[in-house]
């Protein structure tokens, strides 16, 4: 598997390293972006392409009484997101699903906010998604 393919859909041991690198490497831009978005303390948010779950954690912090769902099509990413957000998942404030942006299991109008941090360039068809 090439480096680029492992950024798109992390797999195996190299994928675990990639997900950790993304959690760290994407932090500054994600934190900056979140300063420009109004998120209420009880919002229901979706993070498409949640990767290693760092942005789920940020959204949970900005919406302490809200509920956050993350979805990613990489099994490695889903596992890391669940591990990083275990407490919020146990509290019922967070859910992490494995799935594809092209076939989301809910309607778009279900959420107050839908985010996609550094992921849309991997989507096969942005207009359809």
What is each stretch, according to the model?
Residues 1-15:
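N-terminal, positively charged/glycine-rich alpha-helical extensions of SAM-dependent methyltransferases
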Residues 17-18, 29, 33, 55, ...:
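Hydrophobic alpha-helical segments typical of transmembrane helices
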Residues 44-103:
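Class I SAM-dependent methyltransferase SAM/SAH-binding core
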Residues 127-129:
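A short glycine-rich, Lys/Arg-flanked "PGG" loop and its adjoining helix->strand segment in the class I
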Residues 102-113:
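A short acidic, Gly/Pro-enriched loop at the edge of an enzyme's catalytic core
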Residues 24-43:
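Conserved alpha-helix/loop element of class I SAM-dependent methyltransferases that forms part
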Residues 112-125:
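A short SAM/SAH-binding and catalytic strip from SAM-dependent methyltransferases
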């Amino acid at each position: 598997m090439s480096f680029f393919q492992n950024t798109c859909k992390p797999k195996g041991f190299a994928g675990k390293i990639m997900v950790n690198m993304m959690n760290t490497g994407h932090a500054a831009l994600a934190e900056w972006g979140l300063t420009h978005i109004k998120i209420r303390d009880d919002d229901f948010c979706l993070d498409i392409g949640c990767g290693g779950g760092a942005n789920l954690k940020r959204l949970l912090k900005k919406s302490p009484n809200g509920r956050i769902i993350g979805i990613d099509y990489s099994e490695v990413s889903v596992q890391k997101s669940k591990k990083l957000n275990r407490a919020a998942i146990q509290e019922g404030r967070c859910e992490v699903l494995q799935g594809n942006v092209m076939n989301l299991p809910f309607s778009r109008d279900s959420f107050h906010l839908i985010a996609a941090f550094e992921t849309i360039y991997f989507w096969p068809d942005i207009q359809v998604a």
